[in-house]
Amino acid sequence: KRRANKKDFFGINVRELKEDEIEVFKDLMNKTSIRKGFIDRPLGYYKQMYSALSKDKILRYMVAEIDVDKCRKNAEAEISKISKRVEKLMEHEASNAGRIKEERVTINSNQKIIEQLDILEKEKGKIVPLSVVCLLTYGKEAIMLLAGNDEDYLQHFNTSNIIVAELIKLCKNEGYDYYNFYGITGNFDPKSESYGLYTYKKQYGGEVVELIGQFEYQINSLVKRLYDIMLKAYKLTKK
């Protein structure tokens, strides 16, 4: 909740992408697929999905984008405000040592944010998309089908949390009863590679629901073996 509440401070705007902006979604999905080691869909697939399902709001591509100027202005204002507090606390430095230390940590944190904003603006401009979600809605349920992030800046601006919090509020206001975070591996071992995905989805207060599952019927075992080999080779090249 604390992270999600940083939306206004960071100048984050969550909105629906238009048809001519689908490449924004594709770009962040591609970056995420390389980082996570899965095969991303081609741009044409996402465009076909949009064409078939967006008219009735069944499918929406959502983006969280940062306003660099707004965020910098807020961080600078925060530094100025805290610096004045520290100046006042320094009048009785010995008794306020703990608070002074905490305030200086916050100042340093905001200075790092400004440093990241300078890099971000130089590389990508003033309005920068950092997180995307493919949202599907049907009946009484909203499904977070796909999600992608710019990992280089995720640590500083928390857009993966902000976009989810905003979409949960959106879906609640639209009358949906459930927000489905979609799949997890079912491996709840804290040492497993997939545990982070589970904790990320669980932190919003959701419940784990086990569905019927799926099975594979191999029509051609040779083709299936070739596919598995090629998939493994593809993932190795991505690493």
Show where each model-derived region lies.
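Acyl-donor binding region in acyl/amide transferases
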Residues: 128-130, 137-204
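Residue-level detector of anion-binding/catalytic polar loops
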Residues: 13, 177, 207
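Short alpha-helical interface patches
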Residues: 19-26, 30, 44-52, 161-172, ...
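Low-complexity, flexible helical/coil segments
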Residues: 48-54, 98-101, 171-173, 180-182, ...
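A conserved beta-strand-loop-helix scaffold within acyl/acetyltransferase catalytic domains
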Residues: 1-154
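C-terminal catalytic domain of photolyase/cryptochrome flavoproteins
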Residues: 159, 183-239
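Glycine-rich loops and low-complexity Gly/Arg-rich segments
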Residues: 38-41, 87-90, 157-161, 168-171, ...
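Residue-level detector of family-conserved "landmark" positions at structurally sensitive sites
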Residues: 17, 43, 181, 211-212
